[in-house]
Amino acid sequence: MVDRFDRFVAIDWSGARGKRHKSISLAVADGSGGPPVIVEQNKGWAREEVLAILLDLPDRTLVGMDLGIGLPFADCGAFFPGWSDSPADAKALWALIDQICADDPNLEATSFVKHPVASCYYRHSAGDCGEQFHLPDAPTREGRFRVTERAQRDQGVRPVSNFNLVGAAQVGKSSLTGMRILNRLRGKVSVWPIDLLPDSGPVLVEMYTSIAAMGGGARKGRTKLRSYEALNEALAVLGSPPVRGSGPLDDHSSDALVTAAWLRKVGNDPRYWHPERLTDEIARTEGWTFGVP
């Protein structure tokens, strides 16, 4: 595992509608050292442009994307309980979403969240909650969670259900558009742990940027680094040189920068590739968040 990766890419993702997005941010940290750097795109990134980059990665690249690579499955043995078309595993889920959204522009996922059956599993707004958003015996009204998300709570972070499409916590849209990307990477980029960690070739993992920030010393509940000074404090903890700049910094850029530096620090550590609670079945269906033990 030593020196398996020498290039570390972090992508702060967005599921918003539209062609270009200032909220998508890419950062790269080189294994030989130096500060992480933002890959500039002044007009905002298009999802198709990010896909093109991912399809042309050097072999020893580790990519972390801030999205969910799967949906809850272990809690009731299905992504969409009661739906005859519910896929059997994560790769079939990606393919189903991409198929249903084939006519959506900009790799969006509007058709899936408006699908007559799939829509029933999502919270669409404060007053529009699908009848399948909660399981009948759900202990809370937060929606369903994957095993890795329940484990994240043990780390002190607060993940949101991937079936939630509401407001700033609408991780569901980011995950759905991301799954369209993942479906198009099949056979070209390994997606851990849904794919086994290969001996060579680029690898993509799911990231929760709060975990990276906490790795840089950020306190629980205060993981958004909204100034160059706060970012550089975290980078110092991660053994990285500082980035240039002072004053306010948008959190899309800071999330990507601190995550790239964190991936460089831990990406070649075998312990991070063997989470205690990850089973073959969970890997095949729900996936896992890199950095969750």
Regions found by a protein language model. Give the residues of each.
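RNase H-like (RuvC/DEDD) metal-dependent nuclease/polynucleotide-processing core
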Residues: 2-9, 13-293
